[in-house]
Amino acid sequence: MRLLFFTNLSLLLGLLPGTPMAQSVTDQIAEATLAAPEPLRDGARVIVRDTEGRPTILRAGTNSLICEPDGPQPGFGVECYHRSFQPVMDWTYRRLAEGARTYREAYADGGPEADINAGAMQYALIGSTQEDAVATMSIKLPYATADSTGLPTEERSNGPWLMWAGTAAAHIMFSTKPPGVPDESPGR
């Protein structure tokens, strides 16, 4: 009974289990959409995840973009992605809840890649803190290779490159990361 009372109280206050207590729903929506292109922010669906990786809708959307605020993993990370990514993202966050150490490890481990639309976009701001977060964008291109695209497969700090070449998860990466910044922020 007491748990039910506090759960209902947190929902009335605009807070969801597993989300930072200091952030209102309005603040979470503003944070989540930071990675989205400006013209798409107001129409993006915004979701937050509980500790088991299950999504809850904070705001319904009017376009094809889904955005998520920073979660409990170390570091700062917000992301927006085309709605065809949602099954993969749900799977990835379940893997994190089950013990995958980083976002990249959870995502790279497999999952329902086949249903993501070729050409679908994903946008992210990732860093140790919000202040040092760098923007990355990726374009889904299943089974693309260096030969089929003319892109390098080595990470580049300021230019396109092909990540996970030859796999269902292959995608073109664009990063604004300055040279010398580590490949992966903590928890991502």
Which stretches of residues belong to each language-model region?
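Bacterial N-terminal signal peptides
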Residues: 7-16
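Positively charged n-region of N-terminal signal peptides that target proteins for export
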Residues: 1-4
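Primary mode marks residue(s) on the alpha4-beta5-alpha5 output face of response regulator receiver
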Residues: 23-188
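Sec/Tat signal peptide C-region and signal peptidase I cleavage site
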Residues: 18-22
